[in-house]
A protein has these predicted regions:
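Terminal, low-structured helical/coil segments at or just beyond the last alpha-helical repeat
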Residues: 215-260
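Structural motif corresponding to the intra-repeat A-B loop/turn of tetratricopeptide repeats
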Residues: 79, 120, 127, 168, ...
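Residue-level recognition of tetratricopeptide repeat
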Residues: 67, 74, 115, 122, ...
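N-terminal leader/linker segments that initiate helical-solenoid repeat arrays
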Residues: 22-90
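Residue register of alpha-helical TPR repeats
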Residues: 60, 67, 108, 115, ...
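Sec-dependent N-terminal signal peptides
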Residues: 1-23
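Flexible helix-coil transition and linker loops at the boundaries of alpha-helical arrays
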Residues: 54-60, 97-110, 145-158, 193-204, ...
């Protein structure tokens, strides 16, 4: 996928997640509230979680500073200052990782870490440093998977995970690693189909599914994926719901004329 397309997808995805997390950040532990507590999320997996380890006062202070750094990073990123955003995110991430390691079952902190890594990836992507973007995507992947498993009705997290998988698949496909890209697209397809099944009229859901189908059709010999991608492209081109990222591929698949 062209670099411009990747950055466009990053912009779309960041717009979906940043406001949601901005409301959760103030609820992070404070110096008088230890981060390691018994999980209260009713949607958490039923299996036994690793025992929590109490954070030290120093670690709690560092975590509180990380909340401030993350918030500053968001502000910088939203104003277009991605270099400052990266500096702030990278200052925040180590303390957030420590909190997650102290209590892996505390989903608020898992969510915080997933968002921090993802936002950092987006900032690097906006600066054209796509190798770092993909590396951060890979680092964030287990945390997004954990969130989606714990909160199966959270469509926003599910779509972000699908988008990450698609971009990682695109990177491998661009390097001619079809075998490496195929399972990433397959996982993304499952997630995207669920989102479309829940809300078939949502354009974000449809475009994520189309992206996954386009990738899957190029990474395997399964002609069903290409057939589905062609049919979906025709419908979305006709009703105008295809986004700028998918439009060139949709036009190529259907033989539709391309502008310019």
């Amino acid at each position: 996928m062209p670099k411009s397309a990747l950055i466009a997808f990053l912009t779309l995805s960041t717009a979906m997640t940043a406001p949601a997390f901005a409301q959760e950040a103030p609820a992070a532990p404070t110096a008088s509230t230890p981060a390691a507590t018994t999980p209260t999320d009713p949607a958490a997996p039923a299996e036994a979680a690793p025992a929590a380890t109490a954070m030290t006062p120093e670690q709690i202070v560092a975590f509180n500073t990380a909340v401030t750094d993350f918030t500053a990073g968001q502000s910088a990123q939203q104003s277009g200052d991605n270099a400052t955003a990266v500096t702030k995110y990278e200052a925040a991430i180590p303390a957030i990782k420590t909190a997650v390691e102290s209590d892996p079952s505390k989903m608020d902190n898992v969510n915080f870490l997933a968002n921090a890594l993802y936002a950092n990836a987006a900032a690097y992507g906006a600066m054209g440093q796509l190798d770092k973007t993909i590396a951060l995507y890979g680092e964030s992947l287990p945390y997004w998977r954990k969130l989606v498993e714990a909160k199966p009705t959270d469509a926003a997290s599910r779509n972000i995970l699908a988008g990450i998988l698609i971009q990682m698949g695109n990177q491998k496909l661009g390097a001619q690693d079809k075998a490496g890209s195929a399972p990433l697209y397959s996982e993304a397809l499952t997630l995207a189909r669920k989102s479309v099944a829940e809300n078939a009229t949502d354009n974000i859901n449809k475009n994520i599914l189309l992206s996954a189908l386009i990738g899957a059709s190029q990474s395997t010999s399964d002609t069903a994926h290409q057939t589905e991608a062609v049919e979906m492209s025709k419908k979305m081109l006709a009703d105008g719901s295809v986004d700028a990222t998918n439009k060139p591929s949709a036009q190529a698949l259907t033989g539709a004329p391309q502008a310019g």
